[in-house]
Amino acid sequence: METLHHPLVKMEDDYALSSDSEPNSSCMASTWDWKNNDERYSLSQTPSPQSLSPAVSYESPYSSSSHTQGLEEMPFSYSLLQYPSLCHGDNGDLTKKDHGHKPSMTVQRRRKASEREKLRMRAIAEALHTLRNNLPPMYSQGRQPLTKIQTLKCTINYISELTNLLQCSKRV
């Protein structure tokens, strides 16, 4: 990664937008000339000490010798950069890196949490059932039972009506 960072920083410096420093200049005036600058930003021209293989081999049992002669005359040798050693195991195979995952809940803790949630939901359902049973029939919608929210809203309305009745009876 270090070797990749330096050419990118250099490219960033060479091709910085000229409009940032000079407001009257065109955005990427003549500094963007990729056809003439390709030798500065080509892939590695010499084999790096970090490469896995010195050059890409195009030889196969079916290739002719004239074909390989043309490849030897190529001015560049494209090399593969070595993977960081953190991604490889002892035998060179790719391994999954540990990113500090949270330890998962044990089966026993999950069961206990599930039981607590069931009991909580059961208690809420029983309380709503009690509210529905104690509401006057005028608040029920006939055959269908009230939903949780409808039950709570009807209960609030019923309590406010009872409160108003009590306040009116105290005045008289």
UniProtKB/Swiss-Prot annotation:
GO MF assignments: DNA binding; DNA-binding transcription factor activity; protein dimerization activity
Chief location bin: nucleus
Disulphide bridges, residue numbers: none
Domain annotation bHLH: ranges: 108-162
Statement: the UniProt record of this protein carries the keyword Coiled coil: no
Alphabetized UniProt keyword annotations: Developmental protein, Differentiation, DNA-binding, Nucleus, Transcription, Transcription regulation
Entry protein name: Mesogenin-1
Keyword ATP-binding: no
Organism: Xenopus tropicalis
A GO biological process held by the record: cell differentiation
